[in-house]
Amino acid sequence: MELPVPVAILTSNQQTKWRLLIASFSSHKNTQACLNFLRGTFCKTDDCYCAGLLVLVSLIQTEDNMIEKDRVIQMAILVRSLAEYCFDEIFQRVYPENIESMFTECSRRLALLLECECGCMECLETVKGLQKAQISYRMPRLNPHEISSYEFTLSSVYNSAVLCNSVPVSKDLLRDIVMGSHFEGGFSIEAKKEASLLAICITFCWLFYKMQQTVTGALEDIFEDMMQFAVTYKIPLESKRDLCRLDVRLLKKIKERGAFMGGNKNVVKFPIAAGTSLYKQLSAYKRQLIGDRCPFDPDYENLKKMIQDSAGLFTQTPPCTEEGSPPDITVQECQSESVGSPDKGEGDCPHPINTSPCLKQVSEQHLLALDALLAESSSCPETQTSLSGVNSDEYLSDPEVTSENYLTLEEFERKINLL
C-alpha cells in the first residue's frame, strides 16, 4: 500500500535538489547525502523533516539497494573473519567483542615492536602515529621503511567512504594487503612474522569498520531521529513491537498532519510503500556483521593460506648443522646442548650433570648392558633399584643421601666395559 507523504520545500532550488536526490538514489545509493540535505533544509522538529525521513526509508528498501547492501555485508564478513584470524595468531586468545578494541590493541602492539626492534627516526615517527591512531580516522602509517602499494588505494577508500558513503573493497585489494605487509631491515625473523600479522590485522579492522559504517551508520542516524519524533507525537516505545511498528505509526501521523504542513511553502507529495520495519532491517544487518566466521568460504580459506605463507607461520627453524648432531635438532637446541645445559625438569636433580665434551648418548648396546646389570642385581634385595624402590620413602627422603645410590656416567661406562 502506498501513501502520499507531503514534504514542504522552502525554495525552488531546494525542491530541485531534493527531487534530483530522490530520482538518482538508485544510482548513487548515498543515504548519508540525502540525510545531510534534509538536516540542512529542515529543523529537526519540523514535520517535513519526519516526512523526508520516511521517504528516505522507503528508498533504502528498494530491491537494487538491498542487493548492494548484501554484497557489502558479505565482503565485510570476509574481512572481519580474516582480521580475527590474524588476531588469534598473534595473541593466542579469543579476540575482543568489537573491532575497535582489536584495532587499538594491535596498533599499540605494533608501535611497541617498532620501537624495540629498530628505533630509528622513521620508526619513532610511525610509533607516534600508531599511538594516536583511531579507527574512524585515516589509515595510519604502518611500515616506516617503505610505502606499500595498497596505501594509495586505502586513501581512496577513505575519501569514498566520507564523500560517497561507499567503500569499494575488492578481493584483489585484500590480496594486495596480505602480500604487501612485509617488514625488512633490522627486524628478527620472529619480529617480522608478528609485524606482518599485526599490519594485516590493523588494515582489515579498519576496512571492516568503514564497511560497517556504510551499511548501518546512516540507518542508525535515521532511526534515532525517528524515535525523537515518536516522543514528540507521543507514540509509545515500550517494547520491541513498538519499535518495529514505528515506521507505520509515524506515517499515519504525518498523513494526519499533512493538511496544515505547507503554509506558504511548496508542498511536494511523495508516494511511500510501507515495507520492512527499519528497526528489523537494522537489527538484521548488525547480526550479520557480527555473526560467525565464514570458514567454508573458499575466498576465506585462500586468503588465510596466503596470510600463513606471507607471515611464515608454519616455516620451520633451520636445522642444526653441527657435526655429529641429529638432523632434527634445531640450532637453538644444538647451542644449548653444546654448553651442557642442565635438566629442565622441575625441582633439583640429584644426578650429577653431564658436562662431558663428548656429549655421548645412551645407545642400544648400553641399554642391553643396563638390562644385564639389573638382572644381576635383582638377586640382592638390599641393592635393588627398581621403579617401586626408587619411589619408596627411603629413596625420596633426602636428595643428598640418595645421590650416593646412583652411578655417575663414568662409573656406568666402566661397569659396561667390564662385561
UniProtKB/Swiss-Prot annotation:
Pfam families: DUF832. InterPro entries: Herpesvirus_BRRF2-like. It comes from the Viruses. This is Uncharacterized gene 48 protein. It comes from Alcelaphine herpesvirus 1 (strain C500). The gene is 48.
